A protein has these predicted regions:
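Well-ordered beta-sheet/strand-loop patches within structured domains
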Residues: 2-141
Length: 141
C-alpha cells in the first residue's frame, strides 16, 4: 500500500500559516522575476465613458447560513471597495485584486464572513471577497 504524501498545510494550524506565508512569498518572488507592472495609479477624475455598470445584492438569504455572516460580508466589501475605486489600469499594466486590497485581516477591520471551502459553506476573516472579484470578472468580460 502506497503512503500518501502529506502537504505542509495538512499538519495543523501553525504549519498551515507557514505554508500560506511560503506561497505568498513564492508568488511575490515570481511577480518580481517576471517584472509584472501592477496598476497602482488612482485618479479622482471621472472617465468620459461608462463602459459597464452593475448592481449586486449584497445581503442574501442562503439556506441555513447565519445571516450575521452576510452582514459581516457587507462590512468586508465596504472596507475593500475604496482600495479599488478610481484605480486606473493603463496599457501594459496588470490588475491584481490582492495587490490593491492586500491581506484581509481582523487588524484591518475585516470580519468573519461567508466562504466556500470544499463545496461547503464556511466562514473566515475577510469572507465575501469572492463576490467582489466575481463582479469584477463579469464586468471585464
Amino acid at each position: 500500500m502506497e503512503m500518501q504524501r502529506l502537504h505542509l498545510y495538512q499538519l495543523g494550524p501553525r504549519a498551515y500559516a507557514l505554508s500560506r506565508k511560503k506561497e505568498i512569498f513564492k508568488r511575490n518572488f515570481q511577480d518580481r522575476m517576471h517584472r509584472i507592472h501592477f496598476a497602482q495609479t488612482y485618479s479622482e477624475a471621472c472617465l468620459p465613458v461608462v463602459v459597464n455598470k452593475h448592481n449586486s445584492l449584497i445581503r442574501r438569504k442562503l439556506g441555513k447560513v447565519d445571516q450575521q455572516l452576510q452582514e459581516n460580508k457587507a462590512v468586508n466589501l465596504a472596507l475593500a471597495a475604496p482600495r479599488l475605486t478610481h484605480l486606473l489600469i493603463r496599457p501594459g499594466e496588470t490588475f491584481s485584486f490582492w495587490h490593491c486590497v492586500g491581506e484581509c485581516t481582523a487588524e484591518k477591520g475585516y470580519r468573519e464572513g461567508l466562504t466556500i471551502s470544499g463545496n461547503h459553506p464556511s466562514s473566515s476573516i475577510g469572507g465575501g471577497m469572492c463576490q467582489m472579484t466575481n463582479l469584477i470578472h463579469w464586468m471585464v468580460l
